[in-house]
Structures are given as structure tokens and as C-alpha cells.
UniProtKB/Swiss-Prot annotation:
Source species of the chain: Haemophilus influenzae (strain ATCC 51907 / DSM 11121 / KW20 / Rd)
GO biological process, one term: cyclic threonylcarbamoyladenosine biosynthetic process
Family, as annotated: Belongs to the HesA/MoeB/ThiF family.
Protein name: tRNA threonylcarbamoyladenosine dehydratase
EC number of this enzyme: 6.1.-.-
GO cellular component: membrane
Function, as annotated: Catalyzes the ATP-dependent dehydration of threonylcarbamoyladenosine at position 37 (t(6)A37) to form cyclic t(6)A37 (ct(6)A37) in tRNAs that read codons beginning with adenine.
MF-aspect GO terms: ATP binding; tRNA threonylcarbamoyladenosine dehydratase; ubiquitin-like modifier activating enzyme activity
Lineage of source species: Bacteria, Pseudomonadati, Pseudomonadota, Gammaproteobacteria, Pasteurellales
Pfam families the record matches: ThiF
Length: 261
């Protein structure tokens, strides 16, 4: 074995030895071979990518087409003065390589949609993490993964909340206090033949919070419905958006290691 290869192995083990000591060396080796897709690299998804990179995941695929805006600074990991206007996927890819130089990072500079999901999702992922906030796209993505036996976890709305202790994971059929996931659930039942029986599980993990939403104060000349769709919409804090992401990654790693053990 060459010196360069040995140095790379030693470097990886030095960087992520703490993960191996926590989960076992064999588990770290499995994470090193894992390929995870993150869809939506925003207030939640950027923290998902960070946690995956720092867990020694060997390959990541990042799907998003948004650039970084100054209004993202309150909650999105890559948003800083020097990154405004840059693509979120590119900034996060560069960051991942600084954390783990041997990680393969694939960038898909596009928004996932029903029209392209068959292409973007059939790439041998060990897990897909859904961190998008469009109801129809979210439902279509979940249904596609379910139908094609692709492991997926979905993440609910992280805005309008302040208490990270109320975040939890449950089956998508059982979430409460989350309007986004409630709408997704309705679309899945209406358009994708998911069970109408409230007692039957969807077998899809979902991250959500039980905290009642905190609505922003009304802005003059902007109705409640309009406020939720403009720059004065739900407020959001890093402590919440990051925790949503960390919950998702924790569950994904747990499932990956249990599946392969």
C-alpha cells in the first residue's frame, strides 16, 4: 500500500475517529461507504449536510438551485457576507471538502420536480433526506421514494418556533402541529393512494415540532395570508432549523447502521 493511500486512511481516521469510538469502527466504515442525497440546502438542509459531512459520510449528492440571499443569514449555514449571491450547493460542497477531503460531493443544480425526480432519485442512494418546503413537490418525492423502495425521511416546517425540546420524529401519518406535513399527508392520500385510515402508518419518518406556531406581527398593508408568502413570513432561528436537521441525520445514521449490522 502506497504512502499516499496510507496517509489518506490515517487522515480519515484522525478526523472521524470520534465517530468510530462512539458507534464502533465497523459502523464508521459503513458510514464511509454510504451515499446520501440531501434535497433542499436551506435553513434545515444546510445543517443536514454539515452533520453528514462531520459524521464521515463517504458520498453526498446535493440538490438545489437557489443562491444565497442576505435574508438567509439568520438560519442558513453558508450565508455570510462573502457568500451572498453564490449557489448554496457550491458553497456547501466546498465546505464539505474542507471537513472531509475524500468525500465525493455531487451537485445537481436544479430543483427537484415530478418531471425530473426519476432521473435524480435513481442513483443508488442509501438514504434521501427531504428538506424542501413545497407541498406538491414534497408529496411527489415521498410517493416516488415509497413506490421505489428508496429510504427517505421528510422534514416539516421549522419556521415560527423557538423551543427545540419540542422537536421529535414520528411516522408521517402521526405528526401534529405542522401545517406543511398536514398538507403533504392530504395530497398523499388524495393523489397517491396512501391509506385514508388514520390508524395506518405511512412508514415514512418525519421530523416535526409539537410547538404551536408563532405568527409574525401583522405588517401594515399585508394580510395574514400574504404575510406567510412574502419576506415578512414566519421568523426562524438557527437553534430550531439546525436541530430539525440534526434530528433527521441522527435517525438516518441509526437506520443505516441497524440495517447493515
Amino acid at each position: 500500500m502506497g504512502i499516499t493511500v496510507m496517509a489518506r486512511i490515517d487522515n480519515y481516521e484522525q478526523r472521524f475517529g470520534g465517530i468510530g469510538r462512539l458507534y464502533t469502527p465497523d459502523s464508521l466504515a459503513r458510514l464511509r461507504q454510504a451515499h446520501i442525497c440531501v434535497i433542499g440546502i436551506g435553513g434545515v438542509g444546510s445543517w443536514v449536510v454539515e452533520a453528514l459531512a462531520r459524521s464521515g459520510i463517504g458520498e453526498l449528492t446535493l440538490i438545489d438551485m437557489d443562491d444565497i440571499c442576505v435574508t438567509n443569514i439568520n438560519r442558513q449555514l453558508p450565508a455570510m457576507s462573502g457568500t451572498i449571491g453564490k449557489l448554496k450547493t457550491e458553497v456547501m460542497s466546498e465546505r464539505v471538502k474542507l471537513i472531509n477531503p475524500e468525500c465525493t460531493v455531487n451537485i445537481i443544480d436544479d430543483f427537484i420536480s415530478p418531471e425530473n425526480q426519476s432521473d435524480y432519485l435513481n442513483r443508488g442512494y442509501d438514504y434521501v433526506i427531504d428538506a424542501i418546503d413545497n407541498v406538491k413537490t414534497k408529496a411527489s418525492l415521498i410517493a416516488y421514494c415509497k413506490r421505489n423502495k428508496i429510504n427517505v425521511i421528510t422534514i416539516g416546517g421549522a419556521g415560527g418556533q423557538t423551543d427545540p425540546t419540542q422537536i421529535q420524529i414520528a411516522d408521517l401519518s402521526k405528526t401534529i402541529q405542522d401545517p406543511l406535513l398536514a398538507k403533504v399527508r392530504s395530497v398523499l392520500r388524495k393523489d397517491y393512494n396512501f391509506s385514508q385510515n388514520p390508524k395506518r402508518k405511512f412508514s415514512i419518518d418525519a421530523v416535526f415540532s409539537t410547538q404551536p406556531l408563532i405568527f409574525p406581527q401583522m405588517t401594515e398593508g399585508c394580510s395574514t395570508s400574504a404575510t406567510m408568502n412574502c419576506a415578512n413570513g414566519f421568523g426562524a432561528a438557527t437553534m430550531i432549523t439546525a436541530t430539525f436537521g440534526f434530528f433527521a441525520v441522527s435517525r438516518v445514521i441509526d437506520k443505516l447502521l441497524k440495517k447493515k449490522s
